């Protein structure tokens, strides 16, 4: 009976250590993902601004032409 309690305590102790290590790794992975998201947001903003500028360059001359009627 005593040896069974010892082995159960050992399994419980090792299991809690394993769970805490997994939780630390999971937190580290989440931090890395958050850091990567910031970089991808910047890339999306850069792509959006480039596209917006190209559209504006095409639309503005036509708009000025129609507004001021000087083509």
Curated annotation (Swiss-Prot):
Q: Which residues form the propeptide?
A: 23-45
Question: Which first-to-last residue range defines the signal peptide?
Answer: 1-22
Localization, per the record, is: Secreted
What would be one Pfam family of this protein?
A: FSAP_sig_propep
**Which BP terms in the Gene Ontology apply to this protein?**
defense response to fungus; defense response to Gram-negative bacterium; defense response to Gram-positive bacterium; hemolysis in another organism
Which tissues is this chain's protein expressed in?
Expressed by the skin glands.
Question: Principal place where this protein is found?
Answer: secreted
Q: Which UniProt keywords apply?
A: Amphibian defense peptide, Antibiotic, Antimicrobial, Cleavage on pair of basic residues, Cytolysis, Disulfide bond, Fungicide, Hemolysis, Secreted, Signal
Offer a single GO CC term for the protein. Answer: extracellular region
- Can you list the disulfide-bonded cysteine pairs? 65-71
As for family, the record states:
Belongs to the frog skin active peptide (FSAP) family. Brevinin subfamily.
Q: What does this protein do?
A: Antimicrobial peptide. Active against a variety of Gram-negative and Gram-positive bacterial strains. Active against fungus C.glabrata 090902 and C.albicans ATCC 10231. Shows hemolytic activity against human erythrocytes.
Protein name in the entry? Brevinin-1SN2
Species in which this protein is naturally found: Sylvirana spinulosa
């Amino acid at each position: 009976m005593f040896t069974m309690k010892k082995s159960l305590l050992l399994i419980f102790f090792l299991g809690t250590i394993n769970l805490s290590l997994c939780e630390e790794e999971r937190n580290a992975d989440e931090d890395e993902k958050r850091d990567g998201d910031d970089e991808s947001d910047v890339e999306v903003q850069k792509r959006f601004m480039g596209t917006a500028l190209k559209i504006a360059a095409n639309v503005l001359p036509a708009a000025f032409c129609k507004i001021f009627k000087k083509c």
